[in-house]
Amino acid sequence: MGQKINPIGLRVGVIRDWEAKWYAEKDFASLLHEDLKIRKYIDNALQEASVSHVEIERAANRINIAIHTGKPGMVIGKGGSEIEKLRNKLNSLTNKKVHINVIEIKKVDLDAKLVAENIARQLENRASFRRVQKQAITRAMKIGAKGIKTQVSGRLGGADIARAEQYSEGTVPLHTLRADIGYAHAEADTTYGKLGVKVWIYRGEVLPTKNTSEGGK
């Protein structure tokens, strides 16, 4: 079933940790919805900042947010102006003290979400779906990926019948739990309708650690 399930969810508690690191006996639902509001606001506010994922930790009346991005300068802004605006907005949104930590992604071509979003943007600019997939694969393998698979589906090239085309290079062992596999999907809005983009990137094997194993229990 490794080819059906989300590769990230399958590995939580084995080699991956949770992106929401908190527990609540009461008000769990309201805190979960607050997390969703925070993530949605950050996605909308930082659409051009190449944000890969957001980690949220809670302690008493404080929220610690880690933003993983390929463009930290755009998130922080000149003299920290942009991150201060973001912090103030999240403070008012949650009525809690918010601390933001910006973490730079140094190899953006090995991050599945950033690769998928880049392919989607190029498709919206009417680039060839074959060319953009092959270019993404070449860049990822050149920078150190062990394997990569991409898939674009929909009315490709304006065809009347929707179909899916995928390209791959190297190996992507979806059944191996210790395999560090990034997965993401994105959508491209074209004149012929939406195109779906999926990306799997295999970055090598990771040995399970005690902390991540306990986090899955």
From Swiss-Prot:
SMART domains: KH. It comes from the Bacteria. It holds the Pfam family Ribosomal_S3_C. One of its GO terms (cellular component) is cytosolic small ribosomal subunit. Residues 38-106 form the KH type-2 domain. The keyword Ribonucleoprotein applies. One of its GO terms (biological process) is translation. Gene3D superfamilies: 3.30.300.20, Ribosomal protein S3, C-terminal domain. The keyword Ribonucleoprotein applies. Keywords: Ribonucleoprotein, Ribosomal protein, RNA-binding, rRNA-binding. One of its GO terms (molecular function) is structural constituent of ribosome. InterPro entries: KH_dom, KH_dom-like_a/b, KH_dom_type_2, KH_sf_prok-type, Ribosomal_S3_C_sf, Ribosomal_uS3_bac-typ, Ribosomal_uS3_C. Part of the 30S ribosomal subunit. Forms a tight complex with proteins S10 and S14. Belongs to the universal ribosomal protein uS3 family. Binds the lower part of the 30S subunit head. Binds mRNA in the 70S ribosome, positioning it for translation. This is Small ribosomal subunit protein uS3.
